[in-house]
Amino acid sequence: MAIDFKEHIASVKDFPNKGIIFRDITPILQDGKLYRAATHELAEYAKSRGAEVIVGPEARGFIVGCPVATELGIGFVPARKPHKLPREVESASYDLEYGSNVLEMHKDAIKPGQKVVICDDLMATAGTLHATKELIENLGGEVVGAAFYIELTDLKGREQFPDLDIYSLVKYHGA
């Protein structure tokens, strides 16, 4: 029997700001069976895309992507916030509602031609996905898919990537 992950995501009104509904995945993470099941679904997706490495943006992308890579027996590459990596990095900036941010990866993190699936907790406006994809491609990798626990469809992030295969465990339409 398939799991309805939406039943296990907490919706918190007016967080972090009034008018926002925060979709909280921690109930899934706190239940080992649910966490394993969510990981397995994303791993099956990544496997179907031929992933050779998983990339996860800081911070919840680590929580989502690391166990996927472990299940598949492939590597995990973190896309970090600035000044967190000790060696030479590639950087990409992206816009947020309230400003901009930067992600970085080690320049040797992705091999040319390597097939990559990006894993993260949530896709909203897709700013983080844009920056992560740009980093991977600048390093010579091929983004073959992106996988999320949650997709907020009203924010139309998916529409920005007509040629990218995107998988989500749960989709929210409106509030």
Curated annotation (Swiss-Prot):
A single GO molecular function term of this UniProt record: adenine phosphoribosyltransferase activity
Family under the similarity heading: Belongs to the purine/pyrimidine phosphoribosyltransferase family.
The species this protein was found in: Lactobacillus gasseri (strain ATCC 33323 / DSM 20243 / BCRC 14619 / CIP 102991 / JCM 1131 / KCTC 3163 / NCIMB 11718 / NCTC 13722 / AM63)
InterPro entries (UniProt xref): Ade_phspho_trans, PRibTrfase_dom, PRTase-like, UPRTase/APRTase
Protein name: Adenine phosphoribosyltransferase
Pathway where this protein functions: Purine metabolism; AMP biosynthesis via salvage pathway; AMP from adenine: step 1/1
Disulfide-linked positions: none
Statement: the UniProt record of this protein carries the keyword Zinc: no
Alphabetical UniProt keywords: Cytoplasm, Glycosyltransferase, Purine salvage, Transferase
Function: Catalyzes a salvage reaction resulting in the formation of AMP, that is energically less costly than de novo synthesis.
Domain of life: Bacteria
GO annotation, cellular component aspect: cytoplasm
Principal subcellular localisation of the protein: cytoplasm
Assigned EC number: 2.4.2.7
Annotated HAMAP family: Aden_phosphoribosyltr
Description of how the protein assembles with itself and partners: Homodimer.
Compartments where found: Cytoplasm
PROSITE patterns in the cross-refs: PUR_PYR_PR_TRANSFER
Reaction(s) this enzyme catalyzes, per UniProt: AMP + diphosphate = 5-phospho-alpha-D-ribose 1-diphosphate + adenine
